[in-house]
From Swiss-Prot:
Subunit structure, as described in the record: Interacts with host CTPB1; this interaction leads to gene repression, but also seems to interfere with the repressive function of CtBP pre-bound to DNA, leading to EBNA6 mediated up-regulation of many host genes. Interacts with host MYC; this interaction enhances MYC stability. Interacts (via N-terminus) with host RBPJ. Interacts (via N-terminus) with host histone H2AX; this interaction facilitates H2AX proteasomal degradation. Interacts with host TP73; this interaction inhibits TP73-mediated apoptotic pathway.
The organism of origin for this protein: Epstein-Barr virus (strain GD1) (HHV-4)
Pfam families per record: EBV-NA3
Record's compositionally biased regions (Low complexity): 710-769, 776-798, 876-898
One Gene Ontology term from the biological process aspect of the record: symbiont-mediated perturbation of host cell cycle G1/S transition checkpoint
Recorded name of the encoding gene: EBNA6
Biased composition (Polar residues): 445-461, 622-641, 664-679, 862-874
Protein function: Plays an essential role for the activation and immortalization of human B-cells. Represses transcription of viral promoters TP1 and Cp through interaction with host RBPJ, and inhibits EBNA2-mediated activation of these promoters. Targets host chromatin through interactions with host transcription factors, especially RBPJ and IRF4. Alternatively, EBNA6 also regulates the transcription of the EBV oncogene LMP1 in a cell cycle-dependent manner.
Record's compositionally biased regions (Basic and acidic residues): 12-31, 680-689
Region (Disordered): 1-70, 356-504, 516-646, 663-922, 948-971, 984-1009
Biased composition (Pro residues): 479-495, 563-574, 899-916
Keywords of the record: G1/S host cell cycle checkpoint dysregulation by virus, Host nucleus, Host-virus interaction, Modulation of host cell apoptosis by virus, Modulation of host cell cycle by virus, Repeat, Transcription, Transcription regulation, Viral latency, Viral latency initiation and maintenance
Name assigned to this protein: Epstein-Barr nuclear antigen 6
Amino acid sequence: MESFEGQGDSRQSPDNERGDNVQTTGEHDQDPGPGPPSSGASERLVPEESYSRDQQPWGQSRGDENRGWMQRIRRRRRRRAALSGHLLDTEDNVPPWLPPHDIAPYVARNIRDAACRAVKQSHLQALSNLILDSGLDTQHILCFVMAARQRLQDIRRGPLVVEGGVGWRHWLLTSPSQSWPMGYRTATLRTLTPVPNRVGADSIMLTATFGCQNAARTLNTFSATVWTPPHAGPREQERYAREAEVRFLRGKWQRRYRRIYDLIELCGSLHHIWQNLLQTEENLLDFVRFMGVMSSCNNPAVNYWFHKTIGNFKPYYPWNAPPNENPYHARRGIKEHVIQNAFRKAQIQGLSMLATVGEPRGDATSETSSDEDTGRQGSDVELESSDDELPYIDPNMEPVQQRPVMFVSRVPAKKPRKLPWPTPKTHPVKRTNVKTSDRSDKAEAQSTPERPGPSEQSSVTVEPAHPTPVEMPMVILHQPPPVPKPVPVKPTPPPSRRRRGACVVYDDDVIEVIDVETTEDSSSVSQPNKPHRKHQDGFQRSGRRQKRAAPPTVSPSDTGPPAAGPPAAGPPAAGPHILTPPSARPRIMAPPVVRMFMRERQLPQSTGRKPQCFWEMRASREITQMQQEPSSHLQSATQPTMPRPSWVPSVCALSVMDAGKAQPIQSSHLSSMSPTQPISHEEQPRYEDPDAPLDLSLHPDVAAPPAPRAPYQGYQEQPAPQAPYQGYQEQPAPQAPYQGYQEQPAPQAPYQGYQEQPAPQAPYQGYQEQPPPQAPYQGYQEQPAPQAPYQGYQEPPAHGLQSSSYPGYAGPWTPRSQHPCYRHPWAPWSQDPVHGHTQGPWDPRAPHLPPQWDGSAGHGQDQVSQFPHLQSETGPPRLQLSSVPLVSSSAPSWSSPQPRAPIRPIPTRFPPPPMPLQDSMAVGCDSSGTACPSMPFASDYSQGAFTPLDINATTPKRPRVEESSHGPARCSQATAEAQEILSDNSEISVFPKDAKQTDYDASTESELD
């Protein structure tokens, strides 16, 4: 990279010489920096420069020169680097995408209103179903709208593909079969964190992933690097708490006061609001009342909000006009004493005056608009009614509390539809005994049967020819509803290719091949109960979809003979169907009813927990099928099959069978996170079993121990077939795709008997024959990583280091082995023990667990008792290794129970925390005011709810070389403080004990920022 030094960059060049010629470099330097403004003066002054500089005291002139000079140099270098793109990287440097126009910071309401306006267009109807019909609050609407916005922007300019994949993870989401209807699209967006007015905003990358019905099948899906907001210090947490509390209180105020709150927050100028933004006299008086409440309010959070917003601590009352002016309210015709009375009354009543008087809280949940809204605020009513059809939006107005009529979809399908006009069904004619002539009776009786349905004229009472007075009230005849003639049901034609469910799978799919003919018995037996059961799967929830998918479900009384229906959909009363053998009949696609319940048919009917996803249903079905004999297909569906076993993982990778060629397809295409798929190793999904304690002596990647063998102690002395071939452990997968395995000369001996090994070790077999694997090293993926508790870092035997008898020991720390030349070239990180946890390059095979520590070094025990909350959980530490030097400063927390079953660690990128997580919500961080349900940044506010509170973990240092450095880690004075802070009786607080927390309202304005 070139050094950015021009002519004037050396410190020796005189102060006012322009370092670069503006014409040659093309820089246009608007700010020449300190120094005489005329560049023409420089030639004249150069010879006398040294003399004039000598007249000043030397240090002062050097200081001035350096200050001004270096500023200018830095500015010039910065600009030059930015122009040539050197700050980022030299080749194909793309400047970050910026919006083409200036963007005003969004107000949440504006975005929401824009969403309401947008969904008037017909092609955005789906968006309106998603956003408006679900009655969400503004925050959720914003999430949806931002996602849609990203999607649109991403269509406009293609996806941002980072070449090296720096900080990005992406999967290729391919659907293996043409007909799988679900595709994924993502959109990314560079935006700023929502800091008001963009002071101190961070640039972050947002990503939305959309599933689309018939998307293109191969698309890169990116998910951005995770951005976590920086942890807030105690003052910020206090501020967040106050702001959240005020927002919570505002939600409980009447709408007119909420509006004034919003105006003050938007404008920040009371005078401007008073003069320009209040429309009716009632609005003006509301403002006066609000100011009265604020002037007497003693809630610290509201006080803080008010003074922070208006920008000073002594509010001025805008109705007090200067003496030479006619005050504004007088011009509006409001008397002075009215204003004074309203103000005093509000001062006396305080905050309770603003609260709603028993009206429902109308924040997008209540569908009713309360009377006080419409009655009190005439101005808003005029605004809203200016256009009756569409919701009207005024920038100063909160959106209507009532759902606009245009968005009401339709009444739910369960109730019969109420028509607004009278019909014979809704308004049956009152039956009164009116005398009519016999002739009209006969005419009526003759004409009735031909009428297709009862109409209002024909439904007049039909009386018997000889009425008896007793029977008169009872002989009112209703015409019986016409019985539908049983129509023979034709087998429905093969359906169109239109896909309906979220993940509906048809019989020609590769994902799951269900052959209707092969399972006639089970399908025909288990089908009848289906229409009478509540649907258990989430795919068939909407009535509309069922009505479309199924032929009309006919109750047994209505149908004709049972054989009339298609073979799989007979009524429950039907006997066993006579089915032609599958070879004889033409292969038709399953009729829609079968398709509707196709996957559900094989599920156990237990009322246990419902399967959440397709793979889970698939897994539980296969498991129950394995447990039944093939003969048990004939058992009736009323008898429930085995419930889903609790150990079935929620996502399991099953090899699926292709319809034509019955060979298993690797299902790693089907789910991007299936456990067998070789995802990049930072993404390796892990499952945890919540009850087993975190057993840190075990290697995190041991999935399940193959065959019960002797527990893991001295691996080195065992015969070769079971030795974990030490040459293997240092090899972190990500660096090189394992070509090195074949060439390694040193570790030949342990490999000896690999082909003869018993079955439990099956994944390793054929090791020498493996060709160097392809890019994602598919062939390698099932090998359980070396089954040894991390043996430290072992040099390969060729280096001649003896390895001692217990597994945690890695040889003495000789300076020779630490030297970067001598350590093994693939050793993932440096050789020296570190205090606390280092974060090495993440290699799932070799986590760097600090060795165990026994209490042998003198003052060990009281150091253990220093953590009272630890003692209660784990009991006295059971120490497994006898003579390992202490390496970690928080050693006692590593004492772990004896290895039981290997657990599957939590999916996280970071090494396990050095102390058990403590939810400091319980410990209590000093908050002002109530705990607010709508509080943002809850984790920040709770002092980082999931940060380990390890106070005396020092920053990682290199160990001292004296032998005493292997005793317990030296604790600085921080440990003494930590002991006070963590002792039983004291609550954990972030401040030292004597510092009193200052109140914001007492502090000056500059401190607030």
